[in-house]
């Protein structure tokens, strides 16, 4: 019979639908490529961070061994070994400023010590040492070691990102703010602070002032200098003990 076995015609796919499917497929490929590229970038960054950490560890160990060797050589020769002048200080505000002179108030602001038990790193030079002397009755300060710098940044470290105090929970936060200076991770940040590197100013300004706890066991005499049995002023390497009590 005529027309009885005619095949049913399949309706043609509209051009708009074909175009839509093509665009979707292209978009999917682009997304997959981007995802793969990001994955490879993260992998490369992780490897770089690991290599940097290893390099810094070696550098710190070498510095420590050099100090020990120089001290031994001096003793052997019957001399005293005088270490290099410290380049880094950690400063903690220990008193309020009611009734103080505007000069003291201004210096504390420049040091970013706006509250009691705030702490900041300071690069030591003639100008900064003079500033510390002006506010010495209101601060405790000294020379932090690598362990103290490491513990402060890892435990109490917050970054200034878009004028906000943001916890440093991810290396990506550091890379976004300081990547242009070659600082992409916590280890870079610690190294720059600890060695007072070329980008110390940028790294230090990125760090929000540390909010420390009241020291375990309390304080002795805030108004008396450390050398007289009090808490104020320069306590040199003994600042590390105070940091442990407050961190």
From Swiss-Prot:
Gene3D superfamilies (alphabetical)? Ribosomal protein L30, ferredoxin-like fold domain
- One Pfam short name: Ribosomal_L30_N
Q: Which InterPro entries does the UniProt entry name for this protein?
A: Ribo_uL30_ferredoxin-like_sf, Ribosomal_uL30, Ribosomal_uL30_CS, Ribosomal_uL30_euk, Ribosomal_uL30_euk_arc, Ribosomal_uL30_ferredoxin-like, Ribosomal_uL30_N_euk
The lineage's top-level taxon is Eukaryota
Its Gene Ontology cellular component terms are: cytosolic large ribosomal subunit
Q: What is its main location?
A: cytoplasm
**Residues with Phosphothreonine modification:** 16
GO biological process terms on file: maturation of LSU-rRNA from tricistronic rRNA transcript (SSU-rRNA, 5.8S rRNA, LSU-rRNA)
Q: Say if the entry is tagged with keyword Cytoplasm.
A: yes
Q: Which residues carry this modification: N-acetylmethionine?
A: 1
Q: Where are the sequence repeats?
A: 7-17, 18-29, 30-41, 42-53
Q: Which residues carry this modification: N6-succinyllysine?
A: 126
Q: Write down which residues bear the modification named N6-acetyllysine.
A: 123
Using the record's annotations, give every residue carrying the modification Phosphotyrosine. 138
MF-aspect GO terms: RNA binding; structural constituent of ribosome
Q: Does the keyword Signal apply?
A: no
| Quaternary structure and interacting proteins, as annotated | Component of the large ribosomal subunit. Homodimer. Interacts with DHX33.
User: Which PANTHER family does the entry mention?
Assistant: 60S RIBOSOMAL PROTEIN L7 (PTHR11524), LARGE RIBOSOMAL SUBUNIT PROTEIN UL30 (PTHR11524:SF12)
Instruction: Describe the function of this protein.
Output: Component of the large ribosomal subunit. The ribosome is a large ribonucleoprotein complex responsible for the synthesis of proteins in the cell. Binds to G-rich structures in 28S rRNA and in mRNAs. Plays a regulatory role in the translation apparatus; inhibits cell-free translation of mRNAs.
Name this polypeptide is given:
Large ribosomal subunit protein uL30
Which species is the source of this protein?
Macaca fascicularis (Crab-eating macaque)
Q: What is the lineage of its organism?
A: Eukaryota, Metazoa, Chordata, Craniata, Vertebrata
